[in-house]
């Protein structure tokens, strides 16, 4: 925004903020800490510096001030309404998207399909073929346990499921149950058993001896654990495995932002909650 240069007040705010940001970063780099503690300090100080950016406050944001004037105060009123909505409907956390326009089955996850299997941990969806002929071997999709099955079937224009169907594949997708406190003992072995059940059902429905599998994120970790177990047992039910956004080597965790927060204490705290 030109105001950062033309307005003496905003120019002073900007320069003060940048100088303070550099000072914080320099201090973290110089203080006597081991590498993991330094990584944590960088992360936390970065969050603090970003949170206190002048643009996060109305009077420190020239673009917001201009919009306030141009709209006759409507932008401020709209922001206050969003704030109240977040307080009432989102636990006080800022909403990242407006979820009101999205309705599952209406304009989200619209690919026709049916649940062909259900147990305490998941449902298995078989999607309706869109081609006259289909490949015998089905594809079983294992989505993340912390996401929805329709992350791969958002809209007709943004749907891996619809693309696979158009290529003649028989597509099955796991829909994980949202666990509650009473399900806290569900572990990796339980989720691997669920993947095995999904594969068995897909084979039974299609008459195929094996499947191709795609695992995404934590679903990819589960798929790999399933693949390793099947290989150890000499099973040939898994023909191919495709992984998406899936980290398998925990040794690289220290090189990530979240990796700096991994300690015995934080792991135990996560398990308790």
Positions of predicted regions on the chain:
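N-terminal cap/leader regions of alpha/beta-hydrolase-fold enzymes
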Residues: 1-273
């Amino acid at each position: 925004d030109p105001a950062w240069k033309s307005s003496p007040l905003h120019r002073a705010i900007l320069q003060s903020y940048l100088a303070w940001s550099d000072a914080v970063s320099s201090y973290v780099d110089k203080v006597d800490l081991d590498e993991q503690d330094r990584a944590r300090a960088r992360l936390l100080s970065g969050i603090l510096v970003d949170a206190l950016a002048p643009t996060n406050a109305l009077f420190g944001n020239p673009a917001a001030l201009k919009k306030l004037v141009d709209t006759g105060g409507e932008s401020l009123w709209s922001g206050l309404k969003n704030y109240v909505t977040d307080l009432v409907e989102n636990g006080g956390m800022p909403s990242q998207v407006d979820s009101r326009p999205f309705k599952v089955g209406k304009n989200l996850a619209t690919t026709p399909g049916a649940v062909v299997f259900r147990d305490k941990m998941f449902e298995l969806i078989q999607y309706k073929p869109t081609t006259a002929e289909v490949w015998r071997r089905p594809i079983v999709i294992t989505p993340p346990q912390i996401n929805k099955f329709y992350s791969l079937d958002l809209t007709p224009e943004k749907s891996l499921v619809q693309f696979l169907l158009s290529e003649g594949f028989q597509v099955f997708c796991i829909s994980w149950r949202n666990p509650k406190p009473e399900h806290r003992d569900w572990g990796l072995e339980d989720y691997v058993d669920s993947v095995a059940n999904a594969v068995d059902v897909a084979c039974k429905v299609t008459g195929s001896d094996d499947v191709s599998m795609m695992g995404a994120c934590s679903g990819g970790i589960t798929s790999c654990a399933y693949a390793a177990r099947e290989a150890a047992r000499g099973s040939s039910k898994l023909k191919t495995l495709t992984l998406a956004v899936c980290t398998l080597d925990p040794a690289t965790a220290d090189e990530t932002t979240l990796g700096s927060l991994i300690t015995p204490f934080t792991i135990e705290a996560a398990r308790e909650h």
